[in-house]
Amino acid sequence: MVYSSPISLWEKTASEPDVTRSGFAAHGLPDRTIDVAIVGGGFTGLSTALHCASAGLEAHVIEARAIGFGGSGRNVGLVNAGIWLPPSKVRQSLGPDYGPRFLRRFSDGPQAVFDLIERYQIRCEATRTGTIHAAHAPSGFRALRTRHGEWRDMGEPVDLLGPGEVAGLTGSAAFHGGLLDHRAGTINPVGYVRGLARAARAAGAGLSIGVQVKGLERDGDHWRVRTDAGDLKARTVVLATNAYTDSLWPGLRDGQTVIHYFQIATEHLGARADDILPGRQGLWNTAPIMFSFRKDADNRLLIGSMGRILGTSEDGITQRFARKRLQALYPALGDVRFETAWHGRIAMTPDHLPRIHQLAEGLWTPIGYNGRGITTGTLFGQAMADLLTGMDPMDLPLPVSIPRAARGAGLKSRVFDLAFSANQIWKGLF
């Protein structure tokens, strides 16, 4: 089995070319003051670059590793509407002005993603047949019934499904019901992020790959971005690093708890997988330690859960865990071989809401996506471009904020890591 070589299965199977390896990328840093420098080459950074360049701003992305190297390339690939919180909790947290606006924009989030895919002909295996939030227990179904009622009251296309209906969509009788969200779908996330890079480059944005940002300094009316390849001057800087935020800006990463999420993919299963998720919906469940499940375009099955990869051999904990989950869901499937495994990071905030921080004059960071990176990164990239072209910050989907340390964030990360490892060990061995 191949482990994170170097990113995920998605990198191997993406049909969208990487423009930074095809002779199209400008690796040099501009020697003039530009409008916006963007640190990070994932969904957020490239959406920001695309929308800024399309609006006539000179934008340049600086990425230390490779396009999609962080959470964007390690994503499950579920293009979901909304966030983890149900609509009532969002209204309660954001109030009567921001709450409805946030819900409207995030309800439309999948449409924004699929519109970009269509407009720029991004090759990312886009499938829009919905996603399934599956009840792991009767308590999970009760929570889904409440969530369903709230979305239906807003006129959104979601269906509450009984156990038999979920079995028909998944090929498994293991679930206690579910919520089918017709707004949503699935993609190859590396294909999508590469497509954003191609579109941003075509719109005039610059890309510097393999360049590490070392520091930020305010210099008169602009920022000096210090890198290991020289300095770049920009009137505005957007930090687009989310769960991969380092110590570049003091205290920024202290506002979120970082957890890990792993995935493991089977070999090609061919016709053996035809009756499993025949509509190719992606699925995740209501369990406290979440489990996700989907198929790729080549009929591989992808199993995911919270935590890191534990062992890469056939007797490794993660393979045992995944094998037992598959046996429980599809006892007739028989034994399968696993081909690829990887894990990535998720940035969790205390209230499960994302943030748009203004760190200083002309310095912004969208951050804290709580596992909803595809839609949030895409939407917040558009929001950054809107801000930089004159939109009133009051028109954002949530208030501009400043970083605040999340109490015990580092300790929580370690505790979660231990709990997720224990979950894998217990379910993999017993």
Q: Where is each model-derived feature located?
A:
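C-terminal catalytic lobe of FAD-dependent flavoproteins
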Residues: 308-315, 319-428
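Glycine-rich FAD pyrophosphate-binding loop
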Residues: 54-74
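N-terminal Rossmann-like FAD-binding beta1-loop-alpha1 element of flavoenzymes
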Residues: 36-61
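Helical element adjacent to the flavin cofactor pocket in flavoenzyme catalytic cores
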Residues: 150, 178-235
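Rossmann-like flavin
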Residues: 93-199
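Active-site substrate-recognition segment that forms the wall
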Residues: 111, 119-127, 213-215, 231-271, ...
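Extreme N-terminal leader/targeting segments of oxidoreductases
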Residues: 1-36
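Glycine-rich active-site loop/strand segments that organize a redox cofactor
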Residues: 74-105
